[in-house]
Amino acid sequence: MDWDQDRSSTELRKEKSRDAARSRRSQETEVLYQLAHTLPFARGVSAHLDKASIMRLTISYLRMHRLCAAGEWNQVRKEGEPLDACYLKALEGFVMVLTAEGDMAYLSENVSKHLGLSQLELIGHSIFDFIHPCDQEELQDALTPRPSLSKKKSEAATGRHFSLRMKSTLTSRGRALNLKAATWKVLHCSGHMRAYKPPAQTSPAGSPRSEPPLQCLVLICEAIPHPASLEPPLGRGAFLSRHSLDMKFTYCDERIAEVAGYSPDDLIGCSAYEYIHALDSDAVSRSIHTLLSKGQAVTGQYRFLARTGGYLWTQTQATVVSGGRGPQSESIICVHFLISRVEENGVVLSLEQTEQHTRRPPQLGTSSKKGIPGNSLDPPAPRILAFLHPPALSEASLAADPRRFCSPDLRRLMAPILDGPPTAATPSTPQAARRPQSPLPADLPDQLAVGLENAHRLSTARKNKTMETDLDIAQDPDTPDLEMLAPYISMDDDFQLNSSEQLPKVHRRPPRTARRPRARSFHGLSPPIPEATLLPRWGSDPRLNCSSPSKGDPPTAPLTPRTRKRALAQSSEDKGLELLETKPPKRSPRLEPGSVLLPPLSLSFLLQGRQLPGNQPDPRAPLVDSHEPLGLAPSLLSLYQHEETIQSRNHFLPAAGLAQTH
């Protein structure tokens, strides 16, 4: 019995709860229905709104009501017929009012013609949900109030001009798509940042209550038309042009001759910045930067220079058009709208407005000097004419010293002709008499080929003579070979163990009549390979054996007891290469800066030695012991005066020797 009573009470409570929720929902629906009918929309539109849309539109309506009541909106004249219907027809865009947070408080009805989205779908939403992510920072900067930069004027700048990319569901044919398939459309927005102070209200206690001012951004958004959608007759106040990405003219309409005085051929290849007033170049540059980043842009009013002087106020709509794949196929199509006629006619503001200024580089004519071999070294044509025909100079001054008026390349080329062949100067012959008379500039082109031929002949004769001298020296059997000399080792970084006061005098080599052979790559030709008898290999030359000295070697003096000569074993070429484990003996430390190179000695002369009696060479023994000093032949020691002691193989002396030296 008790259980039935508890069950009935629980069901009664649930039934009451359901009835209360049903009544609450019905009341909420009735209130929202009343709100929907109070909104300034048609009944057919408001009847299909959901609860969230009704709340969103109601909040936006309350914001606009406060805004209209706070500002100058309520001061509408009652006289005359209303012009609200004509405003939207006159505008090429739609009106949008944004709050400081970025919510769209109001949009005009014609927004659907430009974006494809209805007015009810956008009002109350945040604009950041419908613009490109890269443009959000720019819009946030436009919504931020800017302080005044002038001390005299306390009012801050309220004007705003920027471009936005908003979502559009319209296709090129005018059909509407789903919001998920929307594309980006560039809108040029211009307007002002307004701050309206609401009217003062009194509190129930009787004290006045103030509210913060209402800030909003009122914009007129205009869609930039694509050049393909324009009708061909643009009218007399507009002309079309095509540019490369660096704003150089590639095409221009013929109507520019009527409005500005230029012919299309004068503009092709020139930059558009050359025909813009200098004070407007910064604003146009910012518009071009917007064009390259967003694809479309509209410039402000700027001054386009006229041909005969003065300027025209112009506004340009630019679009980046791609003709194929890659950035090289892209071009910029500009539609220029003239706002005024030519102002300040006759005032020259740029070089492009002068008759003397040539906009294109002059084309060089074909000259008849193609057969002259020296033309490839000459500078461009204006520089050549300046050297051949200098202004305000007589022919006598040119003939006196023609080298003064020649370019460096021409002077180097004609040096054999102007200077003449090197001859022995006599005391009775003056210098001016030995120099040949230079031809006049007028006769120079005709005699240039002959002079070049003589110069070539002279240089060839000198080269052959030098090569014959070098070959004779190289074939001389008494001349030492450079490849067989000991390598030069600089002693600049070694320590000077001897004091400067005890330095002996350097033995100077007697002057030689025959020159040393040049390097093999000096003339581009290698000297002939000497005979095998002149280039003995290591261990294969019989003259290297101490038991049988060669006939041409100089006699050696008796050795001192402190020195011992190392004998070279006579073996085959392979054994000589394997047994050789030492370097040629080094010379004494550098004495003076003048004594740099050793005298040219052959390898057999440097390594000549005599075997001590009672010692037989061991073929398997190393040639030189690293712990024993390397002795030099007396013939080599005789090259250095006051140097009779034998130097150790190492560069540094022991401590005892160092103490004795000092």
Curated annotation (Swiss-Prot):
Expressed in the perivenous zone of the liver. Expressed in all tissues examined during normoxia. Expressed in brain and lung. Expressed in periportal and perivenous hepatocytes and in endothelial cells of the central vein (at protein level). Highest expression seen in the cerebral cortex, hippocampus, and lung. Low expression in myocardial tissue and liver. Residues 572-584 have a biased composition (Basic and acidic residues). Residues 450-501 are annotated as: NTAD. Residues 12-65 form the bHLH domain. Residues 469-480 have a biased composition (Acidic residues). GO terms for molecular function: DNA binding; DNA-binding transcription factor activity; DNA-binding transcription factor activity, RNA polymerase II-specific; protein dimerization activity; RNA polymerase II cis-regulatory region sequence-specific DNA binding; RNA polymerase II transcription regulatory region sequence-specific DNA binding. There is a cross-link at K463, K565 (Glycyl lysine isopeptide (Lys-Gly) (interchain with G-Cter in ubiquitin)). Residues 1-25, 352-379, 417-445, 459-480, 500-595 are annotated as: Disordered. In normoxia, hydroxylated on Pro-487 in the oxygen-dependent degradation domain (ODD) by PHD. The hydroxylated proline promotes interaction with VHL, initiating rapid ubiquitination and subsequent proteasomal degradation. Residues 421-433 have a biased composition (Low complexity). A motif (LRRLL) lies at residues 410-413. Residues 80-150, 225-295 form the PAS domain. The modification 4-hydroxyproline is found at P487. One of its GO terms (biological process) is cellular response to hypoxia. Transmembrane segments: none annotated. Disulfide bonds: none annotated. Residues 228-272 are annotated as: Nuclear export signal. Interacts with ARNT, BAD, BCL2L2, EPAS1, HIF1A, MCL1 and VHL. Acts as a transcriptional regulator in adaptive response to low oxygen tension. Attenuates the ability of transcription factor HIF1A, EPAS1 and the HIF1A-ARNT complex to bind to hypoxia-responsive elements (HRE) located within the enhancer/promoter of hypoxia-inducible target genes and hence inhibits HRE-driven transcriptional activation. Functions as an inhibitor of angiogenesis in hypoxic cells of the cornea. Plays a role in the development of the cardiorespiratory system. May also be involved in apoptosis. May act as a tumor suppressor. This is Hypoxia-inducible factor 3-alpha.
